[in-house]
Amino acid sequence: MFFPRLGALVLALSAGLSAQGHVPALDPRGLSQILTSKKWTVIEFGGPTCVPCVKMQPVLAELQQAFGSRAQIRNFYVTHYAKEAQAHKIMVMPTQVVFDLTGKEVTRHIGYWPKDEFLSALAKAGLK
């Protein structure tokens, strides 16, 4: 069943991303590589049509710009790779997971994460 209003909302939110930027998505191989890169890493486990996930894209893009080469911020679409999502204990979309320089998970958040709260959590975890 198609819900026209929901479809229109997803399209409207997606259209706003092109103006505000987006964060690249990883495949399973890319996920493995990024977690061994010895850089701070933020992965949003979500999906391309999940409304809160789409809403997070401008926040993630702003964080990537703010941290530059000090951190890698990426998407991982659990809708495409359920096995890997299970391995990371992802139960809800979106879930943002922060990994330290060794690839160890240091914090996670479920749902939309406002930028100021996200920055505060990253600083508390050690990424400044």
Mark where each language-model region is.
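Structural micro-motif
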Residues: H88-V97
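A short beta-strand-turn-helix
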Residues: H22-W40
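Typically the conserved alpha-helix immediately C-terminal to a functionally engaged Cys/Sec
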Residues: V54-F67
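Thiol-based oxidoreductase modules, predominantly thioredoxin-like and allied folds used
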Residues: F45, Q64, S69-K83
